[in-house]
Each structure stands twice: as C-alpha cells, then as structure tokens.
Amino acid sequence: MSRENHIYEPDWSGRTDQLCSVNKPVIKKDALALVTGKPVYVDDLAPKDCLIVKVLRSPHANAIVKSVKKTAAERVPGIEAIYTWEDVPKQRFTMAGQTYPEPSPYDRLILDQHVRYVGDPVAIIAGKDEKCVDRARKLLKVEYEVLPAILDFHQSKDNELLVHPEESWKSLCPVGADNQRNLCASAEDHNGDVEAVLAECDEVVEHTYHVRAAQQAMMETFRTYCFMDTYGRLNVLSSTQIVYHARRILSNALGIPKSKIRVSKPRIGGGFGAKQTVVAEIFPAFVTWKTGKPSKMIFTREESQTASTPRHEMEVTIRLGAMKDGRIRAIDLYTLSNTGAYGEHGPTTVGLSGHKSIPMYGSLEAYRFAYDVVYSNVMSAGAYRGYGATQGIFAVESAVSEMAARLGIDPIRIREQNMVREGQFMPAYYGETANSCALDQCVERAKEMIGWDEKYPCRDMGNGKVRSVGIAMAMQGSCISNLDVGSATIKVNDDGGYTMLIAAADMGTGCDTILSQMAAECLECDVDDITVVGADTDTSPYDSGSYASSTTYITGKAVEKACMTLRKRICALAAERMNVPEDETEFTGTGVVHEKSGSSMTMEEIATAAMCNNGIALEATESNCSPVSPPPYMAGAVEIELDKETGEVRILDYAAVVDCGTVINPNLARVQVEGGLVQGIGMTLFENIQYTDKGQMINNSFMQYKVPTRLDMGKLRVEFRSSYEPTGPFGAKSIGAGTCNLQCDGSVVPRTADHERADCNGNCGKRMRVTILYLAAGNSRRFGENKLLYPLDGKAVYRHLLDRLAQIAGRHENWELLVVTQYERILEELAPLVKAGRLQTVFSPDSEKGISYTIRAGIEAAEKQNADACACFVADQPYLKEETAERFLESMEMQKAPLGCVFCGGESGNPAWFSKPYFSELKELSGDRGGKKVLKRHWESVIPFLVEAAWELKDLDRKEDLCCRDTGGCHE
C-alpha cells in the first residue's frame, strides 16, 4: 500500500499485508555502524586512563575466609585500592534483574567472608593498568577454612550442610524459600485428581529427564565503566538488559539512594539472558564510589565461563497418562532445579518448566506441577533464552513421543489430537485462553517441509548409518502478565521528524528497529524519520527491561499508545494555529489538513510553531502493562543421520514454523529463530558444563566448552504462520527470550535430536534395557583395610563413582543401577537411595570367595530385570569421570555392542560391557576369575572404547594409589 493512501487504524486484523512499515524487512538501524567497526561498545567508550578493576576468586567450593594479607599487594606501583569483605557494606541483595519485590532471595554481599563456589569473589583490586593489578592479585595471601561442599544438587534439600546458614538471608516473596533447608523456592500447582485419572489411563509414561547447565556464550563478555559526574552522582555505563533494575540493585548493594546513580547502556554484543543479572556492574561501581575515580571491569572469557549465570540445571520427572486411542488425559510434573550458590532467577525459571509446557496440551482432565529449587556449591545459575521453559518442554515433548511409540501412533498424529487450539483454555497457564493460536498450522507446515510421510520413522542407508525424522512443539509467553511495564516517549523535532526514547535494551537483535517500524506505522512516516535514544535511567521512561520476551509485545504497545497520543496533540496545535475545530482536522503523516477550509500545515511548520507562544508540548509518554501473556508457538521438525558405530548424530535438515502473531520484521525474526535453533542444537550435541569432584569447572574456555558454528549445522529453514493477537501491537506477540528471540526454538531441538538418537538406535528399534552393575565387594587384601570404606576427599572411596553413576542412571529411563556388595555397612548407607528409587542393592556374602561370586549375584539380579546388557563398573575406580562413564554406556548401547571395554595406552580394563548372550558364561566363572576371561574368549566381538587419561582408570589396590590427579601427589 502506498504511503500517500495510507491511513493508520488501531485494528489491522486480516489486513496486515496493507501495512507500510510493519511486516516489512527493514534493515537494522545500527547495521552500518556495527559492520564498519564504529566505537559503540562499553570498552570502546571507556577512557584509556580509568582504573582497571579485577577480583581475586575463591579456589574452594565452600570455605570461610579467615584472613587476607594484602600488604605486599598494596605496595605494587600503580595499585589504587584493594578491598576485602571487611570493607564492603553488609546489607544483602540479589543480582537478579526483576521487578521489586524480587522473587529471588537477598543472599548476596559484594564480598562475603563465606565463599560458596569456586570463583566466588574474595577481594577487589583496582589499579592503573592490567599488569599491576594482575601482579597485586598474585601477591594476596588468603587463609581459608575449607568446608564440606554440596556438589550434587540431589543431596541438597534438607542436608545438614547449609549453603546459606546466615541469619541475614531473606526472601521478599512467598515462594517457598527456606535457607535452613537449602531451598530457594518450593511450590505445587494442580487441577483435578491426577492420581485418579492416571489410574484410569491405558498407558502411563514415567521418566526423569535431566537437562544440564549451559552457557549463554555471548560474544561480548560482561563489562562496565563507571565515573562520577559534576553533581557527585555515580554514572554506570554497562552492557546490560536492565538499566532500571541495575540502578536499584546497585543502590541496594552500595547503600546509596537510587537518585545518586545513573545507569545507561551502549550497544550490546549479545546477552541471551545473561545480562538480566548484574554480574560485572557492582565491582567497578564500588571502586568508583569509594575512590571518586573512573574505573572499568572487563570479564575475561574464563571469568564469563566460571563466574557468570548459565542455564539452570534441572531434573524433570514426568508421568503422562493416555488412552489407547492417543487421548492424553493427565500430566504430573516435578522439577528439581539447581540454582547453584545463589538464588538469582531460581524461583522464576523453575515455574516456566511447567507453566510453559503443560499448556500445549489443551484437553487435559488433570495436571499437577510441583518443584523444588535447591542451593548447591557450584556457580550460580540465572536467565538464559527459554528461561526454564526449555527444560520443561524437553521433558514433556519427550514423554509425548514415548507415549506415541508405546501406543503405535504417529508422533505428529498424537500431537494433532491433543494440542491446544485457538479459543481453548490453556491448563496450567494462569487461567488464560489461547485467543491467538496457529500451532496446528505450524505442525502441519513443518510436516510438509521435512517430508515426514516419506521419511518417518527411519531409513537404513546401508553404510552403517540410519536417518530419521522427529517432531516437537513449543511455546513461550509474551511478557510477565500484570507485572512487566514498557514505556516510550515520542517527541517532535524542529524539522518535523521524531525522537523516540525507550529503556528497552537492544542487544543486537534489533528492537530499536522494530519499535521504530511501529512508530513509523502509527505516525505515517518513514522509519528513517524516527531517531531512537536507548536505555538511560536519566532520560528514558521507566521500562522493566528487555527480558521475558516482552519488548515487542509490551514496549511495542507503549510505542503505539504514545504515537496515538502525540497525533492528537499535533492535531490540537495545528487546529489552534489554523483556527479550526480540532475534531475536523486530519493527521496525514506529512502534516495536518482541514478539508472544509482547505487549510493545512506541514510537520515542519507545526514543529516551528510549537517553539513559540505554545502551551502544548509536542511529545507524549505512555506506558503499557498487560493482564495476559499470549504465547507464541512453534513446531520444529528435524532430520538427523546417526552413525551406528560411533553414535555420532548429524543434523541434516531442520524445518521450523513459528506463530508470533504479526511478524514486525521478517528478516530480523528469521535470523533470531535461526540463532535459537543453533543454540538448541548446541545444547543437545555439543555443550555441557562440567565440574571436578572439588567443584572446579573443567570446560572454562572455548577450547573445552564447544559451541557450534554454522559449519556444524545442516539446512535450517524458517517459516511463519501468523495468528492475530488482539492485545498486541499490530496483532504481534513475542518472538524472543529477552528481546526478539523465539524462546521455544531452543527447546525443540534437544527433545527432537535426543529422542531420535534413541529411536534410530541400530535397526530403528526400542532402546536396550541396561543394568549398570556396580561391584562393591572387593576384599582389599593389599590395601591393609577395607579400601571401599576408606575416606577420600570427604566420603568413602566407593561413593565417588557410585554417586556419578546414580546421576547418569537417573537421566536414562532404560538404565538401572544395581550395587552388589558383601558389606552390610554399604547396604545401610545406601538404604535411603534405594528407598528413593535411585538404585537397587544385592547382598552377596559369598563375594568373600572371589569376584566370580559377585558377578554371578549381579547377573542373576540383572536377569530378573530383563536386562539386555550389563555394564560392569568397579568401586575402586574413584577417579572415573561422569562424562567418560556416560559416553561409554551411550556408545555401547548405541552400537548394540555384544561385548565392550575401555582401552587406554593399548591396555584393556574396566568398565566392561556384556550383552545378554554372554550372561551364562559370566555365571559359569569361578574363584577370583572376572569378566576379562569372557572378553578374551570372544575378543573379535569386543567393541573398544578409548580413554586418553590413564588416571581416570586408576585402580586403588594400595594406599600409594590414592593419587591426586591435580597435583600428582598423594592423599594422606
């Protein structure tokens, strides 16, 4: 539609193709500046002579700082100041960027005497350059009282060890938090009689799904520059999504009024939710406030890996009940979330695991959603694209596909039969109805794009590889209903153009551009006529910030309202100058006309008139808050290729179809969805935050933490099937986690790829039932005492590998953990885990006669479990890493290995794998002969699994073998 014939109307339902600026692929406003390297980021804008701020971090997962000797460090030339826990304010706060009162507990200090994870700040060092600061940091001498740590979040709730024992800890909102129980949050929501409905179902899928923590890995690390202005106010220029929340958090932490603080943001080099938390701001702000000198802090990549706010690790247990015809009747969901050492975003992310997954199925008769969020002694988690929905959708969609397999129903058919549709009430979604929903169209189109009917379920390619397709659905919200506030100020410039002031943060996703498109549509001008002034607490109207997918929906509506108010004021001023009734004037975009008299004024004439003898300000500020949060929906279909020998999964084609209401900018929307797909694939196939047994992060750089590149992806295709949301600007809903990114795309890929990895196993059949045999019955003759019960790093030797295997087994529905022992003490200690259903035990008193008796007892128990294979692990290998053990098991299962064992340096060893045909031979072993005899007898059938680190496979035969891999020394 031409601009000349365009008339703005508030309702464009069914006519969005007639829009002039909205729904058009407008180029990003800052594109040229970014690609030509203009100085637009924090480090570009900070002066070269400002103080450099760094922190000394704890090497221990849980400790009390007894003293910090800083005399030698303070003597280093160029050092301005060194601060410890004794120098900082003592009021607690949260770093989570949330509206006050924050659901996240107040559990932080700037520096705390009690450090709670490896990487927790111990001291702040400020100096004239990096060289002197690094030197001073090395000279600091810290005395620690090392405390036992909780590194397994399954053991946190009601543990006698408290992560936050302090009395000053507090929770401002009723979220079920209790620091005396290590609980950051706990709650339950339900409707209907779940147990009764599940009992009536023909089939119930019950499984626990584990989603590990993952890094946002944005290109620009955390960074902040601070200075004092001429009025004695603290100015903070930061790479943040939340300028107003950041100001309040700094006020709480520093103990100074908010009016003494100004927070603004330049361009941001990515955030994906990480910068919804105040990570770097507090340290330079404290230094500048204390010294009066400008300072900056730039996180290294290692710091951004080890001291940031990654995705919450969650374990989601689901029971899903359905009838034989595929009708899903009930969902019972329990989420255990690991918030880490501090509670940022813990109480809120967990809620989305149920409230943004269960509502996708609109015909439920009953549901229950319960959760616990627990503290542990690892890096604190935070906000990340998907914000908890990712983990929950992964579990629900996996269970639905499993249900389809059990019932013999096509995975797409079971979704079509049960998915929420437009006009339907959404269970577990805050009492809301799906007023705009094209999910059915998304699923249908994804099916067509991937060629489902020709490719489902899988095809053997004849070269040791199989190909398969998978499907999943996802949803998100468009804001935090009844809470999020977006605001916009629009004013007329003296040349007739416009300036728009917003506090929404453009993180590189283009919200400045899409909000300009909306303003241009409302004001019937070109997008280039809109100048955007970004987030600044001194000049921008209040905005909650760019998170919760709220910018397009919430701030966009505020822009629309402000423009309508401004149009009226422009007409009022023009009518006054033309001496005509205001209600007879018409705003045309280029000016105001009065048809009856033929009078008119251009926008430049109106702007000039406003500067003299005028009582009407040609500007308008409007805010917006919504009582509802209409979900965007997505369907994703993927084709993968699986190497049956290695277990490698390769993405061949991904077809994503999105309903985000009216698409404001198709180009920006498409690239954001594509980026989210890559993040989801990375989370599934590449990324995994790992810790040592002492809480030290293993993958603290991009050399160890693998993020995917475009070369790792197959074909990515994105299309839109738009509904029209009546409460959104121009019918739009959100398309972003934090800004303009569809959160659900990050949830679809883990479910699809992981599930099809299982479904494609071997001949595309069912997964193997695997019993993990943990042999804990050795006699310890050369050790001098019972080596299995010998204390090592705070717990018995046998518990080290066992605890890792328990976590592994909990992530795989078809794996069972079975402990065989002759020791009653071990049976007693494991009784709580048996009661909790995490493992089973077998008492084998004859094990004293030799290992063959232990193996026989284990195999007989495995046969009762109908095991297809047994994987034998020995309890005197405490250094075997969880990742290695899980990869061994997955590799053996994926290859349907007849026999298998690990190899290192040309030598074979434990663990070992035995499929069912070899069980009888294992039971025929005698004396102290182990499974190696069976392996040698069938050596041609043994599948090798290579392990590079020999220390992982170390057997503890003598006390001299208690080697510490970190130092090369030995435990006393």
Residue ranges and their predicted role:
Residues 1-176:
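Flexible, low-hydrophobicity surface segments
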Residues 2, 85-86, 255-260, 290-295, ...:
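C-terminal catalytic domains of large/alpha subunits in multi-subunit enzymes
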Residues 24, 30-33, 100, 177-224, ...:
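Glycine-rich loop/linker segments at domain edges
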Residues 163-254, 419-497, 699-706:
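Helix-loop-helix junctions that connect adjacent transmembrane helices in secondary transporters/permeases
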Residues 769-822:
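N-terminal glycine-rich phosphate-binding loop and ensuing alpha1 helix
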Residues 772, 920-972:
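Conserved alpha/beta core of the MobA/IspD/sugar-nucleotide pyrophosphorylase nucleotidyltransferase superfamily
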Residues 800-868, 883:
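Conserved N-terminal catalytic core of the sugar/cofactor nucleotidyltransferase
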Residues 848-916, 920:
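Conserved beta-loop-beta/alpha segment of the NTase-like Rossmann-fold superfamily
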